[in-house]
């Protein structure tokens, strides 16, 4: 028995329904109050909507990137050392588009990826220390690291979803897919690119 009490006014309900036709859902009722239904929600700094398009999240990321790019340009105008520019990029720019990218990066639209890569390209021209990886490659690298961590942890919920080939234990069996949304998500992408050579 527990004595957990929910504040209905601060509680939100979001329904993930990918069917083409809009279907009515019964609202959640706590006590005598209905919980408010929302189309999007921000959780731990990540915004997701009821269709998992990640449009609001990617828009937020692009907005922040443009703000930080302004400061990078100012530092470059002041002839700050390239090493320090690179440090600023990793701390204040790279950290923005890599944060939780495993969740939203795969299904981010081409337009938004292009905007992110535009910021990376502009930064690359100013820093000139080393070639900066495109967003797509950063996403794949993060997926690969996460996959390796899962494979080492039998207690991870996704551990059983990773199936090794019976012919070669070093190869993974591709996951069966039905939707492009799942195709571009973390686990199928990580498995698909597990044996691919890394590229910049």
Model regions: which residues?
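Inter-domain linker/hinge segments that demarcate the starts of reverse transcriptase
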Residues: 1-2, 66
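Charged/polar positions within long, soluble alpha-helices
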Residues: 4, 70, 74, 98-102, ...
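Short, conserved micro-motifs composed of acidic
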Residues: 4-41
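Structured, non-transmembrane catalytic/binding cores
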Residues: 12-17, 22, 60-64, 113-121
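Basic, alpha-helical interaction scaffolds
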Residues: 32-102
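Short linear motifs embedded in intrinsically disordered, charge-biased segments
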Residues: 107-200
